[in-house]
Amino acid sequence: MDYQLPQEFVQLADLTRQFVRRQLWPHEEAVEQQDSVPQELRLRLRAAAVELGLFAFNMPEDAGGPGLPYLAQVLIREQLGQASVALADIVGRPPKALLACRPEQRERLLLPAVRGEKIWAFALPGPGRPTVAGG
């Protein structure tokens, strides 16, 4: 049995490592001191991730993503984990919940998220507030 990583997975990990070192690490100290990521930087990093094909690496091909196997996704996350979460999460993993979009929602919600044009968040209200999450 061959336990070596496929060469294309190694190349993805190397690409991600270079992205982290060149694009994310230089901003870590400033982001930590400011306790936020400036919008201009966020947009620039997202555009770079889209250009390199790293954005939405978790999405299947039929949703506009690369359709990477989980092992390749793990190798990408491993490299992104070398940077601050505040910066690494800009690379983007649109929520898989968007895959449940109805056909009429696909163009408006799912595809722009996969292309990096829309950013999504999930939030719950504070204690004692009504929520529909989980039922």
Region roles according to the model:
Residues E32-Q34, K96-A97, P127-P130:
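Juxtamembrane/interface motifs at transmembrane-helix termini
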